[in-house]
Amino acid sequence: MVELQEKNGSVCIAVRAQPRSSKSMVSGEWNGALKVHLQSPPVDDAANEECCRLLARLFQVPPSRVHLVAGHSSRNKRVMVEGVSAAMATELLQPFLHT
């Protein structure tokens, strides 16, 4: 199960990023983190910005409400999504998780 922490009307999600992929998409779970494939290379923050845009589309919020809080230079990241509860996040992630 993907690690989610709810705090002050936001949810913090563990993310495992794979930059330089052929297609940007959510591909499931990896060791308790949401696995995302990103077309952008990990140069000049391009992959981090693409990760936030991808998650904003997934959670149906504006990109300004998605923030990278940890893992700026790592594949393992923590992303905060404002205005989304843990229950709502779990529901939106369900199609991507193989249980």
From Swiss-Prot:
Gene3D superfamilies attached to this UniProt entry: YggU-like (3.30.1200.10)
Pfam family for this entry, one: DUF167
GO annotation, cellular component aspect: cytoplasm
Family stated for the protein in its record: Belongs to the UPF0235 family.
Name this polypeptide is given: UPF0235 protein Cag_0319
Source species: Chlorobium chlorochromatii (strain CaD3)
